[in-house]
Amino acid sequence: MGKFGDFSSICRMAPIPLCASVGPITSIATGVGIEPDCYARNIEVANTIIFQGAASVMHIVALVMTVVMLLHVRGKFTAVGRKEITTFFYLYMILTFLSLCIDAGVIPPHSGSYPYFVAVQAGLASALVTCLVINGFVGFQLYEDGTPLSLWMLRLCSFVAFVISFLVGLATFKSWAGLGPTNTVGIFVVLYFLNALQLLLYVVMQIILVTRTLQDRWPLGDIAFGLFFFIAGQVILYAFSSPICEGISHYLDGLFFATTCNLLAVMMVYKYWDSITKEDLEFSVGTRMNNWEVKELLPQGPEEDRRATVYADPIYEGHYASGPGTGSGASASGYEGGHHRRESHGYTPSPNRQSLRY
């Protein structure tokens, strides 16, 4: 077990992108970088080698599912926190697309631009978690949702989190400000420690919200499942990635399971938000048919009396009819209840890493 903030043991177990830009410079390697003990085998498509084929497929699935969730969220015009939760899904979509490019090898690990993209990925991860926490405050109605105050506070807090993680990550990869590939305490703190605290804060806030303001307790199940999927993905990635990879002959590794579990956790966030919000159908007639309530039948003229019908007119006179989806029970939208300053551009993967066999 290494010291606090050391990525040596982590990177040998888990094939995470930043491992290509941290670690000591040895006499054998041409640059920094820690290669995992086992990683998923590459695939070849149109004379192009693609890293992490299974994980890349899951990234594409995650993009499709995010689009579906966004369409559902945008369809609930009057739901509480609609614009705020939409920002969360947009950030997740951008992070997933960038992770797809990095994991699949579209951005080569030995290129000069690779550390910058990994730093952006770290910044987006922190911004995503911060955005989720700010969304957690919306339910307490401390301020009006959807207003410039709410939206700009969400954007500014997420942007600050992005800038902090991006700068700390870039300083670590480029040996700036006392940080470096062998001094990774800073990026460890902002990526793991602070983000874990924010996620814990979000879970506690939502439990308080459900138990104290809502009569329905089913949303607690969404929180529990989301927490389970996220923790399971992290445990598989950082504790069992190499054994799984070796056990199934390099076809999959922990990154595939972590990507899948992260998607399921995000889907539980959507399910939780959907279960504690409802919309006012009176203001959603643009996407739903027959939402009008008929107060009274129109008076019949002489020419209408000549129409042949098997129903007697007096039966319908003076009665009220209502279209589906409306009624007096509809309520307003709301909640239901080294010392060497050597510039490095990442390591050059070993010949086995470029092979299609492993």
Swiss-Prot record:
The chain crosses the membrane at residues 49-69, 88-108, 117-137, 159-179, 185-205, 220-240, 250-270. It is found in: Endoplasmic reticulum membrane. It is a multi-pass membrane protein. Residues 321-358 are annotated as: Disordered. GO terms for cellular component: endoplasmic reticulum membrane. The keyword Cell wall biogenesis/degradation applies. Interacts with chs-3. Belongs to the CHS7 family. Chaperone required for the export of the chitin synthase chs-3 from the endoplasmic reticulum. This is Chitin synthase export chaperone.
